[in-house]
């Protein structure tokens, strides 16, 4: 068997990321399977696709912040007590989401948000509110699954997480096929994708839940020891989580905002419904070649030397920051190549839309230009994911909050300005999303530079203090550990670069 010594340090990264990348792609395939379940209903298929797309994108706004609790499990959960606190936070948040879904479905608030703001007709609005009610419990189920997935990732069980997500998609596809042959197609076709979505999430939650109890629960202590800073408090978890939640909320609310402006730009006409349907169909297809890059966020925390579950150092295989940077660049190059192969080569994207989602050729033609714009998304997504992972390791996520604000500002500005330049429909929506991504990644880069310079200043000042008092043993050694860790991080990074040169 051939061995490649130069790749030795990259195999752990590949083994960790590949299941997560497959997970991300599998989620997109699941969305396409759900869209096919709607498209297979020949009567009012476009209207149904638009209604489900509006409801699903609004629901994702609530699911997004809670699913990002995966990163809390990845960084903070070191004991059973930590896990209990994380689950409690998710139960409370899920209950709030259920209440809000119910209010949207049954009160004038829902009529204003869906019918009035989106300028959709009464039929589409009614179907959207009904779908939103059916999706009320999904955010809680999804968040519970992702919380346990984060704990599994902390212990390098990314393969188990990947298997759970693939099983989720398989369950969705199977149930779409089963329900299409049931009486639901005639009675309530909207339930076909929604019930399939629930069954897939239930399968995923069952697998990660059983996996947690099988491989982790008995191997972690009741409470965290002082070597990891003691038990994480709910306040610390929420302080770490809220900037990530805000970012993901703005990412998820971007789709409803795009749907809103695109629909209003076309005055709620038949063309508006068609444009929203095109966006619903192109989101999962366009996201598939680059969406997995988001999982690069988990690489830094998982391979952090301070992670108590990290056994790579003991096994002799050390993954340094330089290895992670090179691996990230390779992933970016691979994603860009995939995007241009799929979206710019003749007939490939149309075949995906026709054969997998089940739309007709005329509808697929409308999706070509929006899909080609997706080819440029990998660059800002990679920059954002790589730097966010580094900041998560330092537990300095608070500096990321402004990036979400800038993303929304750039997104809305583009949605307002581009129509005056002759850009309309789904092309307007995807082009504005790209502008928002670029604005967000720029702000994340600025935040990372700010933190890095601050760390450098700390390193320089503490080196001076160490020289002055190197013969003394400070009484507050434990208390100053967090600060010294940051300095060691920077010092080791410099040493790694010198060693490899």
Curated annotation (Swiss-Prot):
- Where composition is biased (Acidic residues), the residues are 462-471, 491-501
Transmembrane segment boundaries? 86-106, 132-152, 159-179, 190-210, 328-348, 363-383, 404-426, 430-452
One GO cellular component assignment for this chain's record is: plasma membrane
Can the keyword Repeat be found in this entry's annotation? no
Disordered, as annotated region: 457-501
Q: Which GO terms describe its biological process?
A: phosphate ion transmembrane transport; regulation of bone mineralization
Q: Where is the protein localized? A: Membrane
Which residue pairs form cystines in this protein? none
Residues on the membrane's Extracellular side span 107-131, 180-189, 349-362, 427-429
Coiled-coil positions are: none
Residue ranges annotated as Cytoplasmic topological domain: 1-85, 153-158, 211-327, 384-403, 453-501
Any one GO molecular-function label of the UniProt entry = inorganic diphosphate transmembrane transporter activity
Kindly state which keywords UniProt assigns to this record, in alphabetical order.
Answer: Membrane, Phosphate transport, Transmembrane, Transmembrane helix, Transport
What function is annotated for this protein? Answer: Regulates intra- and extracellular levels of inorganic pyrophosphate (PPi), probably functioning as PPi transporter.
**Family assignment?**
Belongs to the ANKH family.
Record's protein name: Progressive ankylosis protein homolog B
Where does this protein come from, organism-wise? Answer: Danio rerio
Gene name on record?
A: ankhb
């Amino acid at each position: 068997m051939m061995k490649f010594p130069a790749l030795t340090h990259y195999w752990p990264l590949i083994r960790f990321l590949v299941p997560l990348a497959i997970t991300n792609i599998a989620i997109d395939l699941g969305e396409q399977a759900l869209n096919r379940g709607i498209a297979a209903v020949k009567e009012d298929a476009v209207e149904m696709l638009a209604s489900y797309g509006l409801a699903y994108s609004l629901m994702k706004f609530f699911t997004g912040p809670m699913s990002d609790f995966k990163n809390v499990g990845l960084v903070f959960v070191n004991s059973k007590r930590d896990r209990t606190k994380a689950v409690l936070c998710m139960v409370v948040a899920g209950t709030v989401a259920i209440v809000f879904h119910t209010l949207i479905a049954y009160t004038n608030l829902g009529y204003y948000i869906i019918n009035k703001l989106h300028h959709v007709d009464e039929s589409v609005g009614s179907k959207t509110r009904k779908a939103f009610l059916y999706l009320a419990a999904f955010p809680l189920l999804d968040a519970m699954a992702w919380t346990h997935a984060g704990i599994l990732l902390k212990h390098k069980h990314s393969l188990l997480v990947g298997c759970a997500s693939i099983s989720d998609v398989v369950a969705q596809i199977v149930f779409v096929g089963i329900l299409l042959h049931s009486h639901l197609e005639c009675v309530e076709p909207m339930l076909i994708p929604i019930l399939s979505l629930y069954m897939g999430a239930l399968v995923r939650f069952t697998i990660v839940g059983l996996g947690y109890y099988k491989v982790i629960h008995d191997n972690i202590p009741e409470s965290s020891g002082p070597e990891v800073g003691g038990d994480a408090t709910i306040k610390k978890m929420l302080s770490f989580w809220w900037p990530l939640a805000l970012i993901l909320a703005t990412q998820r609310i971007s789709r409803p905002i795009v749907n809103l402006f695109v629909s209003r730009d076309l005055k709620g006409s038949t063309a508006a419904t068609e444009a929203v349907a095109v966006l619903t169909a192109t989101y999962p297809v366009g996201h598939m070649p680059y969406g997995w890059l988001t999982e690069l966020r988990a690489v830094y925390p998982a391979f952090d030397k301070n992670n108590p579950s990290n056994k790579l150092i003991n096994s002799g295989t050390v993954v340094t920051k330089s290895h992670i940077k090179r691996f990230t660049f390779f992933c970016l190059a691979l994603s860009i190549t995939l995007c241009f192969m799929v979206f710019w080569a003749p007939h490939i994207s149309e075949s995906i839309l026709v054969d997998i989602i089940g739309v007709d050729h005329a509808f697929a033609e409308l999706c070509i230009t929006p899909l080609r714009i997706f080819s440029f998304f990998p660059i800002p997504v990679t920059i954002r994911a790589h730097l966010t992972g580094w900041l998560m390791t330092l537990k300095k996520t608070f500096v990321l909050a402004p990036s979400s604000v800038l993303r929304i500002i750039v997104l809305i500005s583009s949605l307002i300005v581009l129509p005056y330049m002759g850009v309309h429909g789904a092309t307007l929506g995807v082009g504005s999303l790209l502008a928002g991504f670029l604005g967000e990644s720029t702000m994340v880069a600025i935040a990372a530079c700010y933190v890095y310079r601050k760390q450098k200043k700390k390193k320089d000042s503490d080196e001076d203090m160490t020289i002055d008092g190197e013969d003394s043993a400070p009484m507050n050694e434990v208390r100053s550990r967090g600060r010294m860790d940051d300095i060691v991080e920077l010092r080791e990074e410099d040493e790694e670069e010198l060693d490899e040169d």
